[in-house]
Amino acid sequence: MWQAEVRVDLDAIRENVSWLRSGSAAELMAVVKGDGYGHGMVPAALAALDGGADWLGVCTLDEALTLRREGITAPILAWLLAPGLPLHEGVAAGIDLGAASVAQLDEMVQAGRTAGRPARLHLKIDTGLSRGGATVSDWPGLLTAAAKAQADGTVEVVGVWSHFVYADAPGHPTTDRQLAVFHEGLDMVEKAGLRPRYRHLANSAATLTRPDAHFDLVRPGLAVYGLSPVAGESFGLRPAMTARARVMLTKQVPAGAGVSYGHTYTTERDSTLAVIPLGYADGVPRSASNSGPVHLGGVRRTISGRVCMDQFVLDCGDDPVAPGDVAVLFGSGRNGEPTADDWAEAVGTINYEIVTRFGSTRVPRSYDGERP
């Protein structure tokens, strides 16, 4: 018996990946960073591979090594690498590494020497996000250093990549500008004498809306889990996560009763209150106070009063509600329950954050569609 749970439909992940894979001639990297966007990195990775993913993408070296320890042999790219990490462990495990500066490249050269095999690198160019990646002015120097290291046998340049700013806003001119910069960067790669097998730029949004940005490899993340990166468009994706809890306690209160800390909510009539054992320690944003949608007893309700660390309250009015009844915070939406998109809109964030925070807390995570 569970008090609260996050339930993940692995068949939904398989279905989403299969559909995404069928829509492009490019190979597909399923991004499973952030504990698989809260869905569980290893189960999500295995389901994505079942669905046809060719690659897995993660941020950290630890994430990549965890996948290897779990017996996953598919190609893995890790790209958020601070100085001083034991990169030789990644090289020895056959993990591809993202490089965005000569300093990073130098560390990877040393890692290749220590591991006794070339470090497989994906060189990243900053096409406009101003985050990771070499600037356009630094790009030629990185290419020159990479070409020399490859000639020395300490690295192998496997890929060249970048990341979009506005792909979730189809038609935004920045996307076209970034694509042009990426093409210019690829021309420089060729002039430097490098011939990487993979050129990749497309995130979920570009995978869905910009086939001209698919190149050799696409990198969907959010879409793998059935959520759309483009507002107002579902693309037929199937959400994989449901968050729910059982009613812990019900009580009758009179009209005018203040509810939860600060009494920011007051009952307008005699009402039944339902106490739900989930709070901000479990991923419920405190900003969901008086705004978060919850489905209980066949009715979509709104959190009444402030979200506490471990619980929140619903004003159920005259509706019959009892301890043990199931309150669904979000799911696929097929049965009238809110979705992660509804939650994102209610609290002023994005669906990425909703599933990642709910799935990475003390709430037990369970799975449908597990395979031996």
From Swiss-Prot:
Substrate binds at R131, M309. It is an enzyme of class 5 (isomerase). One of its GO terms (molecular function) is pyridoxal phosphate binding. Its EC number is 5.1.1.1. The active site is at K33 (proton acceptor), Y261 (proton acceptor). Signal peptide: none annotated. Its cofactor is pyridoxal 5'-phosphate. Keywords: Isomerase, Pyridoxal phosphate. Pfam families: Ala_racemase_C (PF00842), Ala_racemase_N (PF01168). It catalyses: L-alanine = D-alanine. Pathway: Amino-acid biosynthesis; D-alanine biosynthesis; D-alanine from L-alanine: step 1/1. The keyword Ribosomal protein does not apply. One of its GO terms (cellular component) is cytosol. The modification N6-(pyridoxal phosphate)lysine is found at K33. GO terms for biological process: D-alanine biosynthetic process; peptidoglycan biosynthetic process. Belongs to the alanine racemase family. HAMAP family: Ala_racemase. Catalyzes the interconversion of L-alanine and D-alanine. May also act on other amino acids. PANTHER family: ALANINE RACEMASE, ALANINE RACEMASE, CATABOLIC-RELATED. This is Alanine racemase. The gene is alr.
